[in-house]
């Protein structure tokens, strides 16, 4: 940051030990979720992840997004009450920035539509007499468009492990049956895995297939990393029934799942098809 430019400092009431159990993947999950949600809201606002192994930088880019300064307020979100997005609670990138700074990463936002750069780091606050997270915002001329979040000091191993978070990393391909509720993932290696809009979530159900649900059908807990098993099994029953009717899953396979009392079809007896 140049010393002769006008810089505004925005202090957040977040101390370094907040969400102390969060990992690198937890933080990136928040950022990926924000990026994919933006694409859901506007199909032209494409989201992509770019990793530069030489520079050890990870860039999360949306082609049309722009950040307003009031999004630094906790609870402030443009996605609240939108049933097609995963995020609902408005904490997102601020918490990710805190965790990544704590882990020794850099976290910089290139808010290109406003010609701004937002740099984050911890500072000793004179107001709060405590170390807190702050964003330093200054003007920057650029021909680039959209929004780019750049995370520095990211190792190859950390990048490669993001497949545990996001189903669509690095052109990941898989066999699937499309339904109105989302995708049934047919590949055996995904058995039991649950995703919502491509993002992995924990689920206690013992499932025969993997599933990638549309957000509006699955209720997530506040941490957005866990879901309600009853809700999941209710929707998987509907998905299996639809796929069976379409011929994407053989009726013999469905009958076997029912006989084995698989959680995928647990709610068959409660639903009418």
Regions found by a protein language model. Name each.
Residues 1-45, 103-108, 112-273:
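N-terminal assembly/transducer modules of large multi-domain enzymes
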Residues 59-119:
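Flexible ATP-lid and adjacent glycine-rich G1/G2 motifs of the Bergerat
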Residues 56-58, 147:
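Short beta-strand element(s) in the Bergerat
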Residues 44-55:
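Short beta-strand/loop element within the Bergerat-fold HATPase_c
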């Amino acid at each position: 940051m140049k010393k002769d430019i006008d810089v505004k400092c925005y202090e957040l009431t977040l101390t370094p030990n907040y969400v102390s159990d969060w990992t690198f993947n937890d933080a990136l999950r928040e950022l990926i979720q924000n990026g994919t949600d933006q694409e859901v809201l506007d199909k032209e606002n494409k989201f992509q992840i770019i990793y530069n192994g030489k520079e050890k930088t990870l860039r999360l880019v949306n082609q049309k997004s722009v950040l307003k300064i009031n999004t630094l307020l906790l609870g402030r979100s443009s996605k609240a009450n939108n049933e097609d997005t995963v995020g609902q609670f408005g904490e997102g990138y601020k918490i990710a920035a805190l965790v990544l700074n704590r882990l020794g990463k850099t976290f910089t936002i290139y808010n290109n539509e406003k010609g701004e750069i937002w740099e984050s780091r911890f500072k000793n606050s004179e107001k709060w007499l405590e170390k807190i997270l702050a964003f330093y915002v200054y003007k920057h001329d650029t021909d680039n468009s959209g929004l780019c979040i750049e995370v520095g000091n990211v190792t190859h191993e950390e990048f490669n492990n993001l497949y545990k978070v996001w189903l669509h990393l690095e052109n990941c391909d898989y066999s699937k049956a499309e339904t109105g509720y989302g995708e049934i993932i047919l590949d055996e290696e995904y058995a039991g895995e649950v995703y919502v809009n491509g993002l992995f979530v924990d689920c206690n159900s013992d499932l025969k297939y993997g599933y990638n649900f549309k957000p509006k059908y699955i209720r997530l807990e506040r941490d957005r990393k866990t879901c309600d098993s009853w809700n999941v099994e209710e929707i998987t029953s509907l998905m299996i029934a639809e796929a069976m009717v379409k011929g994407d899953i053989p009726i013999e396979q469905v009958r076997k799942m029912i006989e084995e009392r698989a959680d995928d079809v647990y709610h068959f007896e409660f639903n009418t098809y």
